């Protein structure tokens, strides 16, 4: 149905000049050229001493070795207590080594994961142990908005439940 003179069909002709490489060498280069997936894996393995710092979450390292199709099939799950503890220990280890500035360390909330009375937490000494223990008790207004509740009504319903439970 389509004619050869159709405007949709574009044909290119390459002039036969002196080629820079013979066809076999060009084919070898094409075969050796890495795919984007292998580039990601080789760049991560290039310096093993920096590899741990480049990927802060040790739980993500096994997923990097998987193909994109395998990664797509994986479902994202919440971390278990053991995994969460491992992430907190890794974060605290980085803080002790001084890799993270003090201002950024206080903003992460990692100090709250330590039990009250543990020396070395600056936030606890300023706020007192009762302030850090009460902080996670009520959800943030943003979390309440995500669930469709208004922050003011959710707070009063929690207060009334707490009063009736006492």
Swiss-Prot record:
Post-translational modification: Phosphorylation of Thr-35 is required for activity.
Chain intervals for the UniProt region annotation (Disordered): 1-166
Family membership noted in the UniProt record: Belongs to the protein phosphatase inhibitor 1 family.
Record's subunit section: Interacts with PPP1R15A.
Ranges of compositional bias, category Polar residues: 153-166
Residues modified as Phosphoserine: 43, 46-47, 67
Signal peptide positions (record): none
Membrane spanning residue stretches: none
Biased composition (Basic and acidic residues): 19-29, 143-152
GO biological process assignments: glycogen metabolic process; intracellular signal transduction
InterPro entries, alphabetized: PPP1R1A/B/C
Protein name: Protein phosphatase 1 regulatory subunit 1A
Region named Essential for activity: 9-12, 42-54
Gene Ontology MF annotations: molecular function inhibitor activity; protein phosphatase inhibitor activity
Functional description taken from the UniProt entry: Inhibitor of protein-phosphatase 1. This protein may be important in hormonal control of glycogen metabolism. Does not inhibit type-2 phosphatases.
Stretches the record annotates as Interaction with PPP1R15A: 143-166
Keywords: Acetylation, Carbohydrate metabolism, Glycogen metabolism, Phosphoprotein, Protein phosphatase inhibitor
Domain of life: Eukaryota
Biased amino acid composition, Low complexity: 104-114
Residues recorded with modification N-acetylmethionine: 1
Modification sites for Phosphothreonine: 35
